[in-house]
Amino acid sequence: MQNNIKIKKGIESLGVEILSWNPDSQMIKYKVTGTPVCQYDQHSRARVGIKFLDYTVSKEPSYVVYTQVWDTMEKDAEFKKEVYETLAELEDIRNNKHCGEELSGYNLMSRECSYVVEQNIGSLRGQMARRLQFCEEEFIVGLHWLLRQKMIDEGIELAHQFKPMCDVTKKCEYAKADYLSNAFGCLFAGCGRWKSHADYASFNQSCTTPELVKEQTGITCTKSEYELELEKSE
């Protein structure tokens, strides 16, 4: 922390609390904390069978940054200094009543927030299929793996059924989905859960990895049949 500015790493501070579960209606209510505004923005695009409540942006200058940004800050003292100075400058603007209502309420997409979700199991099953895939961003991936584990811990047995879509199709879905353009679909290398068919990737790494999820949340992600077969053959 510097100048009262707090910066948190990736999904280390991510929290998921199951508030209620109704096995008859198959409705779940859960609270998400320690996540950035950009993750809420991505999550709240879901529309069917889901409701978002009590969205609250931190009044304190608390930010959650991508792991790669955090690691860069740790390696580059000058970059870290500039980040804190920029955030402190933004806080001065937010607290200056003479800047006008538009600027005083401005939130960077990395500012910490919390919210509550009410969702039916059909909607959640669809979201899990997409968001458990490591080609998604670390915040949304971490949230859904953590939620899955919390449901299992609460004895909600059907959570064991939740798996990434690529485990259902038994092939890498990245770079070929209809909603991805060819340009966007080759940004990152495949995660290795299934054999990748992409010939080129701008970044020689997956967008998110099971190792990152394990390191920052303590959750061991289940492995695919492909990965287990590879382990047997080694």
List PLM regions with ranges:
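Family-specific signature for flavin-dependent thymidylate synthase
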Residues: 1-234
